[in-house]
């Protein structure tokens, strides 16, 4: 192989390594964002369950009050 071909090959390898490094950084950033999104999702699910419980409690109280009104 000539020196020129080896230089071209070296340049392409360096470029490929740089691309791989950039992609690895991007993957790490996306993993962090995914983890943050998962945590936010878990928090929202927990809040949703709490609100459903409160809603059910209010419905029971309302039924009880309506039952008392019917008895009057």
UniProtKB/Swiss-Prot annotation:
Role noted for this protein: Non-essential, abundant cell division factor that is required for proper Z-ring formation. It is recruited early to the divisome by direct interaction with FtsZ, stimulating Z-ring assembly and thereby promoting cell division earlier in the cell cycle. Its recruitment to the Z-ring requires functional FtsA or ZipA.
BP term (GO), one: FtsZ-dependent cytokinesis
Residue runs in coiled coils: 2-72
Region (Disordered): 34-57
Ribosomal protein as UniProt keyword: no
Stated name of the protein: Cell division protein ZapB
Start-end of Basic and acidic residues biased regions: 42-57
Record note on quaternary structure: Homodimer. The ends of the coiled-coil dimer bind to each other, forming polymers. Interacts with FtsZ.
Keywords: Cell cycle, Cell division, Coiled coil, Cytoplasm, Septation
Pfam families according to UniProt: ZapB
């Amino acid at each position: 192989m000539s020196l020129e071909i080896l230089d071209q090959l070296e340049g392409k390898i360096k470029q490929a390594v740089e691309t791989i490094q950039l992609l690895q950084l991007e993957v790490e950033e996306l993993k962090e964002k995914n983890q943050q999104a998962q945590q936010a999702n878990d928090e929202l699910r927990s809040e949703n369950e709490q609100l459903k419980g409160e809603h059910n409690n209010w419905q029971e109280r309302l039924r009880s009050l309506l039952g008392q009104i019917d008895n009057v």
